[in-house]
Amino acid sequence: MTNKVTEIPKEFQVSPIVCDRYLVDGELKTWKGNTTEVYSTIQTPNQEGKLAPTLLGTIPDMETPAALEALKAAEKAYQRGQGIWPTMRVGERLKCMETFVEKMKAHREEIVKLLMWEICKNKSDSYKEFDRTIDYIVDTIEGYKNLDRKGAKFDKQGGV
């Protein structure tokens, strides 16, 4: 049996994704340096018609200056525990996480397809993996809410 791209159902075929942006200091910046190609172990015909790993896309090949810029931005954001995120009110932090989950859910199909290609999970297992991840984040949010509620309660001890 020979494998051909045409044998892969259209809804599961992929086009390479070019990732030429990176996040530093709350800003998406355009990467102009070298990139690294990301391949699937699933083989499809290459330009010469020979079976080869399938190109999924490219990612920035972050070099020392960009990495140090990211480190400096992280230090600035944290500010020894006095930055925006560590001092943000619980409700605001939870809202950020809930927004992240909703945005992630909007990309479910795309992420599931990439899981299938990148780590060779079948469709059903890829959906389960995605859904488990969402459930874990939601459960963590709920756990944090419960922890915050417990911390806001006062216990009476000895009538006081």
What residue ranges belong to the model's regions?
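Long amphipathic alpha-helix in the N-terminal Rossmann-like dinucleotide-binding domain
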Residues: 65-74, 94-109, 123-150, 154, ...
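Alpha-helical hairpins and coiled-coil heptad-repeat segments
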Residues: 116, 120-124
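Short, structured beta/alpha segment
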Residues: 1-117
